[in-house]
Amino acid sequence: MANEVRVARLESLIKDVINNALANEINDKIAKLARVTAVRLSNDLSVAKIFLDAHKRESMPKVLENVNKVSGLLRSKLAAEWTSYKVPELRFVIDETIDYANHIDELFKKIKQQEN
């Protein structure tokens, strides 16, 4: 397994390159709505799981679909910056963290209301 510092640096590079490409180099207006919130590399660095979010949560399925359509271009942008042996396969997923945090907030509000 690659050391933690190297993995963190590579994950940060992927996040920066993909966010920059989505914001500045992609012509797809729907894909431009996406923002990378986190990246997790596999132990062998062959797969990058990229977590996406968009301002309008209800548009995420369409955003994810369009980002997947331009994934080849995104991977080529990453290849230009990549310093390791092989550019990882990019797998895009919807980041559920915000939904989970909102759910937890709602639970806390219900508990607080029940206490009053």
From Swiss-Prot:
- Provide the Gene Ontology terms for cellular component: cytosol
What is the protein's major site of localization? cytoplasm
Which controlled-vocabulary keywords does the entry list?
Cytoplasm, Ribosome biogenesis
Any one Gene Ontology biological process term?
maturation of SSU-rRNA
- Where is the protein localized? Cytoplasm
GO molecular-function term, one example from the UniProt record: ribosomal small subunit binding
| Any matching Pfam family | RBFA
Say what the protein does.
Answer: One of several proteins that assist in the late maturation steps of the functional core of the 30S ribosomal subunit. Associates with free 30S ribosomal subunits (but not with 30S subunits that are part of 70S ribosomes or polysomes). Required for efficient processing of 16S rRNA. May interact with the 5'-terminal helix region of 16S rRNA.
User: NCBIfam families, per this entry?
Assistant: rbfA (TIGR00082)
Q: How does it assemble?
A: Monomer. Binds 30S ribosomal subunits, but not 50S ribosomal subunits or 70S ribosomes.
Q: Which family does it belong to?
A: Belongs to the RbfA family.
Name the HAMAP family on file: RbfA
The protein's name in its UniProt record: Ribosome-binding factor A
Organism per entry: Ureaplasma urealyticum serovar 10 (strain ATCC 33699 / Western)
Organism placement in taxonomy: Bacteria, Bacillati, Mycoplasmatota, Mycoplasmoidales, Mycoplasmoidaceae
